[in-house]
């Protein structure tokens, strides 16, 4: 059963139990463009106590550098090597695991974050933010679109400019069984400014349904994300706690990764009633109203 943290004594005991804290960002540190009040105090406290901090996000629209800048703008100290968005884990997978040949490229259904990270590892790509694809499908497109042996993977993430044209291109590339089908994350929704919008999982579904193929998922709660982190940061998993706002990704990620603990904050997607359900499929070790509460130690 999940333990609710609700007193200064409990906050302190919780913090003292772990050496490493891994944080989701959207719904934990901020919601959309709005910082969650009081969170900076908690982050400063953890830094002052010498805790190791790692930021892990399924948001694929931003590169590591862009994420670092956003975190810093919210008054939270962060270094590039502490930041792991799904765009980074996806590019790492393409380069180090898929080992895409130099003559192959990736078709991106997503934003600049994915493109930036692919550029960083030297992987060629098309699609993505190409402005020529932000339009309706034309009759001449139907004649031109088809399988392309030079496309070695379709990488799908959050795409704010998704079009039927992009779907048609991705669909055709995926007719080649040797073309890998990759998904940055399967989040059904995307929290922003107190609202929920369709997420990467929802954007990928037309391709899953139409091709009959299942993508390799590279974000939380899957191992590929933790492997990308562990390849760069060494820590004792049993002394680490993941802090997130979504049960089926953040908390499940902590369990899949065999971390020492998990903390759900109630400032994002999942709510207290979901934890308290009799047969709740995923339950955190701890939960708290807001990350900001942890600064109220005795």
Curated annotation (Swiss-Prot):
Catalytic activity line of the entry: 4-nitrophenyl phosphate + H2O = 4-nitrophenol + phosphate + H(+)
BP GO annotations: cellular detoxification
GO cellular component: cytoplasm; cytosol; nucleus
Activity regulation (record text): Activity enhanced by Mg(2+) ion but inhibited by Zn(2+) ion.
InterPro entries: HAD-like_sf (IPR036412), HAD-SF_hydro_IIA (IPR006357), HAD_sf (IPR023214), PGP_euk (IPR006349)
Domain of life: Eukaryota
Single GO MF annotation: phosphoglycolate phosphatase activity
Entry PTM: The N-terminus is blocked.
Gene3D superfamilies referenced in this protein's UniProt entry, alphabetically: HAD superfamily/HAD-like
Pfam families: Hydrolase_6 (PF13344), Hydrolase_like (PF13242)
Keywords: Hydrolase
EC number, as in UniProt: 3.1.3.41
Broad enzyme group: hydrolase
UniProt subunit comment: Homodimer.
Protein name (Swiss-Prot/TrEMBL): 4-nitrophenylphosphatase
